[in-house]
Amino acid sequence: MKQARTKESLYEAATMLKRNALDIVAPLDQLVMSRDMRTLTAGDHVGNLTPHAFAQLCRHVDVPVDYAVRCRDSEYTQGAENSTFSRAPLMAQQIANWLEHPVKNSMRLMRGIDPGEGRPVDWRAFLSNRYFPLDSFDLLAMVLKCCQDVEHRFGKVEWASGDINQNEMFVKLVFPGLRREVKRSARVGDVVQWGLYVENNEIGLGRWKLKGFVEFLVCTNGMVSSRVVTDREGNPLVTDKRHVGATLPLEVDSGIQWGDEVYAAAKQLQMNMIEDTIGHLLQPDKLEAEIAVFDRAADSTQSSNLEVTVQRLAETTKKTIGMSDFEQRLVFNKFFSDGDRSQFGLSQAICSQEVARGLDYARATQFEQLAYNVIALPERQWSTLAVAA
């Protein structure tokens, strides 16, 4: 079920994660895996390997992840008395050998969370030493500062929703001064608010992202825009960026040294990029362009068979986010009950509260992105979904 955090709750969690973050760059031959394959020692720090970090480590030393997991979690019997033994030590010995004699880049960045008080670290990621560790706290602080800077133009930013864990963060913000009506919508007084969608991933599964976010006030749902944003000269702006930077300095015991001038400059460059992108995303003409898209979708061809339309949509998502049978049913039920058979109606069903309640927050956010992709489909592509063959 989709459950969002308040601004205060998310900010507190982001602060705690940054305070407890432990980033260590170490040579592979200084890493020691335990015989049960569940902990890893780096310098003076002993930590539990999360499933994600364990998989990243296995892939780096070219050990099949599924095979390593089976060895770690299974046993075998031996001898006349059928004594039981864990397979983990055998696999751990093989991995230890690859760590001691690496065939790839021998330097890795270990990203951990150190709870303190003598408790073990949680190793959450095993990454290249060129990975740029931009913490969610830093990204959020920059975004909120930028929002405060435009308060005199668009009003005080409003918190639409957000969520965070030790791996990723999602934030959706809107401005009361960026409101417009979708005049062709079947819903009377269908007003939207424009703002920002912010996403960050800290464990190598993605990149930071800044997109436009639109909230529909009639039903309090929203969409994440995938529109290409350009500057005044028409050049595409950076709205997402991989976490890659200069090679990080080795500091096995005390972690990455943030005083390094080159790295500090690289971090500031990222912040400047974020600030510039936000400034362009919040221009009123960006909202006007989206309103034109929504009005066109509201006036589009009607679906001749709602169930077939949803099924065809699900087919198109197979190579991206996919849609389970359960999710298709949620979307169809809302599409049917709303009575709006247009392109606009399907997009609203996809990102509706009724659908979101059946999903976790990250999955609901994917559906908000899908909803925008549907509402922005060219007429010919929409017709392939809407019109019966």
Mark where each language-model region is.
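Intrinsically disordered, low-complexity regions enriched in serine/threonine
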Residues: 1-90, 161-162, 174-389
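Beta-rich nucleic-acid/ligand-interaction surfaces
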Residues: 152-178
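Extended non-catalytic scaffold regions that mediate assembly and binding
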Residues: 76-95, 99, 110-116
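Extended low-polarity, hydrophobic cluster-rich segments
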Residues: 104-105, 138, 173
